[in-house]
């Protein structure tokens, strides 16, 4: 595509050089640049793309888009703009032929429940014989083809490329997790959403957003990008605030909840270790529904997916069949099979609200003890560490504090911050830095009927310690320990 065509709708400050050159690709990572490409300088949290212009040119970049004034770029077209992040989204959409226009795009945002909700929506739509794409934390899916996910929401140029691949493969709907970072950093700009979904909002990422109000404002942006409907949990106080504000917009407002009167509701809820059952009440039909993921939080996720499906016209009987056919979501209250006498549950819960929900869900389905193994990630929001410790100390019969992904932080210091919260309670706890040994301790400590809850990493298959990334899968490790310690049931195979 000609550079002049790419720049046609871009608000530029200045252009130096030839505009009639042909651009074969667009990059923001100088290491990936190929000949005849355009390089966009993005100011990141740790690096600044402006520092890698020379490297990009040496690798073949023939045009540079930057926020800073540059000189001495002979033979290279230089384009200065006010905001390269916003422009990257515009360029990506134009370069790939505005692909989101060819998809029914559904965005799901919220602190917790995004992954489960997107998987549920995908399953319902597939039950409606649709070819569905999914973009999220665990993986990206183009129909039945799985593609590794690098982050919850890809950078805008990568996102537009994924949309293009989906459109080329005749995907009809794309369901995607939309993180607050993605909304704040313009990753989903130029993406045309039909439906926006709000699950809930509790303190998280405050190292980035600084306070809960900024966090909510970032999430709220999604509902100004939609054209058909906004689906919002009004039991959540932040959701109620957002719903009140966006109800005046053109897209229809569909609310869901359990406590407050809403468009879509769950009543008479019963939960077991294997599932949650409730009376589904909607404007288009009512039914007794069983979802194979236990917990009240699972009922909320199901309501979000059901309300979304109603918004885009899926028949009620198809919705009910679809939501009940979901086998589960990887790392979301996932039972580790093959263990005798007690249960082991693995969950991604890594926020205060999430860990409270999963511990409470475990307590609701056993009359015995709940032993919680958890930690907190390094180089992330530090304010939640003592809070999570206090929650586990208050609710768990025994807390085993361990490493999550310490990254570049001292693991011991993270553990001490968690311990400070537990000390505010009368809860029993122990500290075992090595995650494998912490899981081993909890499983050896468990008695008949107990639940060992391993929280924080869920589906993740690695652990990051310093600059090292090691293979570590909570489910797999639990199975290995069960076999090593004679805790496995040879008659059950996972």
UniProtKB/Swiss-Prot annotation:
Keywords: ATP-binding, Cell cycle, Cell division, Cell shape, Cell wall biogenesis/degradation, Cytoplasm, Ligase, Magnesium, Nucleotide-binding, Peptidoglycan synthesis. Its cofactor is Mg(2+). Carboxylation is probably crucial for Mg(2+) binding and, consequently, for the gamma-phosphate positioning of ATP. The keyword Ligase applies. This is UDP-N-acetylmuramoyl-L-alanyl-D-glutamate--2,6-diaminopimelate ligase. One of its GO terms (biological process) is regulation of cell shape. Belongs to the MurCDEF family. MurE subfamily. It holds the Pfam family Mur_ligase_M. It is found in: Cytoplasm. Meso-2,6-diaminopimelate binds at residues 380, 404-407, 456, 460. Pathway: Cell wall biogenesis; peptidoglycan biosynthesis. Catalyzes the addition of meso-diaminopimelic acid to the nucleotide precursor UDP-N-acetylmuramoyl-L-alanyl-D-glutamate (UMAG) in the biosynthesis of bacterial cell-wall peptidoglycan. One of its GO terms (cellular component) is cytoplasm. ATP binds at residues 110-116. Its EC number is 6.3.2.13. It catalyses: UDP-N-acetyl-alpha-D-muramoyl-L-alanyl-D-glutamate + meso-2,6-diaminopimelate + ATP = UDP-N-acetyl-alpha-D-muramoyl-L-alanyl-gamma-D-glutamyl-meso-2,6-diaminopimelate + ADP + phosphate + H(+). A motif (Meso-diaminopimelate recognition motif) lies at residues 404-407. GO terms for molecular function: ATP binding; magnesium ion binding; UDP-N-acetylmuramoylalanyl-D-glutamate-2,6-diaminopimelate ligase activity. UDP-N-acetyl-alpha-D-muramoyl-L-alanyl-D-glutamate binds at residues 30, 152-153, 179, 187. Its main location: cytoplasm. SUPFAM superfamilies: MurD-like peptide ligases, catalytic domain, MurD-like peptide ligases, peptide-binding domain, MurE/MurF N-terminal domain.
């Amino acid at each position: 595509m000609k550079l002049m065509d790419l720049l046609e709708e871009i608000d530029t400050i200045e252009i130096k050089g030839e505009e009639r050159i042909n651009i074969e690709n667009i990059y923001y990572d100088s290491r990936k640049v190929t000949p005849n490409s355009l390089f966009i300088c993005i100011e990141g949290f740790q690096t600044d793309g402006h520092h890698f212009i020379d490297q990009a040119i040496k690798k073949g970049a023939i045009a540079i888009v930057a926020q800073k004034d540059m000189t001495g770029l002979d033979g290279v077209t230089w384009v200065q703009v006010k905001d390269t992040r916003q422009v990257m989204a515009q360029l990506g959409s134009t370069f790939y032929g505005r692909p989101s226009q060819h998809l029914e795009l559904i965005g799901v945002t919220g602190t917790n429940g995004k992954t489960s909700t997107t998987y549920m929506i995908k399953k319902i739509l597939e039950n409606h014989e649709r070819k569905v794409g999914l973009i999220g934390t665990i993986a990206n899916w183009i129909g039945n083809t799985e593609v590794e996910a690098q982050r919850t929401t890809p950078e805008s140029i990568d996102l537009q490329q994924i949309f293009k691949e989906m459109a080329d493969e005749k995907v009809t709907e794309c369901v995607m997790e939309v993180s607050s970072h993605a909304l704040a950093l313009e990753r989903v700009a130029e993406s045309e959403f039909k439906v926006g979904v709000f699950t809930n909002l509790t303190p998280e990422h405050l190292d980035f957003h600084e306070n809960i109000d900024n966090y909510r404002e970032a999430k709220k942006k999604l509902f100004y990008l939609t054209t058909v409907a906004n689906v919002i949990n009004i039991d959540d106080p932040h959701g109620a605030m957002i719903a009140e504000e966006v109800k005046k917009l053109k897209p229809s407002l569909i609310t869901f909840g359990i406590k407050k009167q809403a468009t879509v509701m769950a009543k008479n809820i019963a939960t077991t270790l294997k599932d949650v059952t409730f009376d589904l009440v909607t404007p288009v039909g009512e039914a007794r529904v069983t979802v194979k993921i236990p917990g009240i939080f699972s009922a909320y996720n199901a309501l979000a997916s059901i309300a979304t499906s109603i918004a885009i016209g899926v028949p009620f009987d198809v919705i009910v069949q679809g939501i009940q056919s979901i086998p589960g979501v990887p790392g979301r209250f996932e039972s580790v099979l093959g263990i005798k006498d007690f249960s082991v549950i693995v969950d991604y819960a890594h926020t205060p609200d999430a860990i409270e929900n999963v511990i409470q869900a475990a307590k609701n389905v056993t009359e015995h003890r709940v032993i919680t193994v958890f930690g907190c990630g390094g180089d992330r929001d530090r304010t939640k560490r003592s809070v999570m410790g206090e929650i586990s100390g208050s609710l768990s019969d025994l807390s085993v504090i361990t490493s999550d992904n310490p990254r570049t932080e001292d693991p011991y210091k993270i553990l001490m911050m968690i311990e400070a919260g537990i000390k505010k309670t009368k809860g029993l706890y122990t500290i075992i830095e090595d995650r494998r040994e912490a899981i081993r301790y909890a499983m050896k400590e468990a008695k008949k009927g107990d639940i060992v809850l391993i929280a924080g990493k869920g589906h993740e298959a690695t652990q990051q310690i310093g600059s090292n990334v090691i293979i570590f899968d909570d489910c797999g490790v639990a199975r290995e320990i069960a076999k090593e310690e004679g805790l496995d049931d040879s008659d059950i195979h996972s």
